[in-house]
């Protein structure tokens, strides 16, 4: 059970660790994808049924923005997200907005992450942008875009998949929300 908890914490850190100081795509132009909305529960490989599962709650904030909450019974992290496309690759740009302790600190620099996603059979697979290919140390959006373009055909541009299953519509209110 301790190993499962460590895996759960590791998955939480992978999904929520903000990697970049600047966004890959700064503006939200694409309309939201309604099929992403709702509550998603993690699908761990070796779950024993004892530990709480993480939940990913995706709500519509505007025509182009999502409000995203990720966590388990003990802690949550909050993002705003928007769909983007670059080099023919569709992804979601995430910006960390806070956690259970409140909004992000003005001193925090790494507020942005980039994830790809696939939907099918009631499951959502989320993959993180590979920071071995697109360095966390790039300091502006243009440099990030150049590195992204240079690796666009690399099969591990997005890696470390996390799987989630869709829960019923009533589940959107299961997690406490911060307003």
Where are these regions (language model features)?
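Sec-dependent signal peptide recognition
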Residues: 2-9
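Exposed boundary/loop context
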Residues: 10-11, 31
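C-terminal motif of bacterial Sec signal peptides marking the signal peptidase cleavage site
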Residues: 14-17
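Calycin-type beta-barrel ligand-binding domains and close structural analogs
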Residues: 19-35, 43-55, 59-179
């Amino acid at each position: 059970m301790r190993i499962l908890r460590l895996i759960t914490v590791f998955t939480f850190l992978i999904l929520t660790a903000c990697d970049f100081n600047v966004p890959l795509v700064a503006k939200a132009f694409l309309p939201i994808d309604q099929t992403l909305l709702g509550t998603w529960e993690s699908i761990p490989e070796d779950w024993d049924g004892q530990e709480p599962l993480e939940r990913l709650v995706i709500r519509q904030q505007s025509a182009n923005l999502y409000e995203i909450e990720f966590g388990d019974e003990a802690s949550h992290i909050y993002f705003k997200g928007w769909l983007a496309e670059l080099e023919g690759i569709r992804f979601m740009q995430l910006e960390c907005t806070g956690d259970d302790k409140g909004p992000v600190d003005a001193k925090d620099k790494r507020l942005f992450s980039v994830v790809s996603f696939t939907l099918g059979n009631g499951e959502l697979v989320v993959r993180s942008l590979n920071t071995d290919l697109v360095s966390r140390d790039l300091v502006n959006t243009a440099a990030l875009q150049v590195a992204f373009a240079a690796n666009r055909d690399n099969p591990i541009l997005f890696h470390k998949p996390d799987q989630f299953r869709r829960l019923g519509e009533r589940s959107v209110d299961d997690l406490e929300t911060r307003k």
